[in-house]
């Protein structure tokens, strides 16, 4: 028997905190010159002489934000990165670095942590961001992930929530509602499996919805597209908590009103078909769903010609004076006050 066969398998306990960090981060690649020092010291060192630093943090908690009965750990790692990068792109910035912290209970073997981190590293490599630090600790209950994303932008290109003006166009990237419906499909199949473990789910009719829920993509491509079109939005936000909530955030911060047109909301055919199957209203799903990670922005009318006909961008409404309020115009041309219907972490 060889010496290697006599070695006990590595575990989280045998590695310890610092050994685990070394084990997980040994293959990390550095993509940016702004990363002066990454993993391995007391703090990362970042520097860019011309651009301003953008910082955002998101936390994901097992049982609140994800269910490991149908969320693969690799996908969870990937999605946790996307949620943070999306916020940087919503500021019209370039995401360049992340820090990764997690608390994990002793029910998870080392292989599970490796799978989680593989998803994080896959996202980091694909989106060209540097993992520059983080922390690990034990948890008495489940899994907690906290990622901080850092990015940079020229001061004149940074897009806040508070710049929308009356008569600006309301523009949405991609389509919405699919992530929420993907969650509904997975929850339904979970209940079916619990009732009959021998029942194997057939998810072939819901591939787009499930991918949008389990493995979303942040819209880095839109930031590049806007730069190529020489367009700087007046205000922007990512659609993580539902379209209606995000519109209301833009209006509140910009002190404007808005008219959203129901018939302009972009929906994938799979969303429409699944809403019919589940007896759900597709507009309600679009307004309240969340986790789409699309970008929603205010655009000056003078820039409309630059985006006209672009398949990635849809004009779904326009901003008004604040006194006119925030409304959705239905397909029947009825004007209805819009209410915030999105995700709330503190709802009971």
Where are these regions (language model features)?
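Small-aliphatic-rich amphipathic alpha-helix that forms the alpha element of a beta-alpha
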Residues: 73-97, 118-126, 225, 245-250
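Glycine-/charge-enriched secondary-structure boundary and capping motifs
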Residues: 2-19, 23-29, 107-130, 140-145, ...
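Short Gly/Pro-enriched turn/cap motifs at secondary-structure boundaries
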Residues: 33-37, 215, 285-288
